[in-house]
């Protein structure tokens, strides 16, 4: 049995477009590769993201969708252990809220491919609260693969479950120049010993 997906659900398209509009005006970073893995150049997302653009775009998206307008960006900040020692990381946090049963998983998976199409972003990590949800996302990636390939002109993408003991998997994520989707649980993300935190 094969599932048929409707690519034209208006409320889903509005959610995808809302996320994509956050990055309007951001440019491809002009600098070369930022880091290396074992002497090999890694391929980062290359979008120059300015906080003033993000805030202006966020306000426009909120106004368009009848959402109370934020006066400032909200951030997640924490200390993490890296190969260069303890570092504080800080990044903007955005939320897309949808009712249960409206296709949230479909929307955020399609949003990843839309961000690739519009802005050339390649690296995506999906962090979920449980193993059951992780398995559901991996299953959804499998059953939507043909549908997404038709929508995005056979754009190649690779998805998999993060496994901390699989160093080659993390290496592929870093070095690949195609869309990479890594799915992991919050517990595996929070372990200090994980390769992803180094």
Feature locations, PLM:
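RecA-like P-loop NTPase motor core of helicase/translocase proteins
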Residues: 1-198
């Amino acid at each position: 049995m094969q599932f048929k997906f409707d690519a034209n659900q208006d409320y889903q398209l509005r959610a995808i477009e809302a996320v994509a509009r956050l990055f309007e005006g951001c440019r491809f970073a002009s600098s070369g590769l930022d880091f290396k893995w074992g002497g090999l150049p890694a391929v980062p997302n290359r979008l120059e993201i300015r906080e003033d653009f993000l805030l202006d775009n966020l306000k426009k998206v909120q106004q368009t969708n009848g959402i109370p307008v934020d006066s400032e960006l909200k951030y997640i900040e924490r200390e993490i252990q890296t190969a260069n020692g303890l570092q504080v990381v800080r990044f903007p946090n955005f939320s897309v809220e949808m009712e249960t049963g409206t296709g949230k998983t479909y929307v955020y998976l399609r949003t990843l491919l839309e961000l690739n199409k519009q802005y050339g972003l390649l690296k995506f990590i999906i962090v979920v609260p449980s193993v059951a949800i992780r398995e559901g996302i991996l299953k959804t990636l499998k059953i939507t693969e043909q549908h997404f390939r038709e929508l995005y002109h056979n754009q190649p993408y690779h998805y998999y479950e993060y496994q901390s003991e699989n160093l080659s998997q993390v290496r592929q994520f870093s070095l690949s120049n195609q869309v990479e989707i890594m799915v992991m649980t919050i517990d595996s993300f929070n372990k200090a010993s994980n390769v992803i935190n180094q």
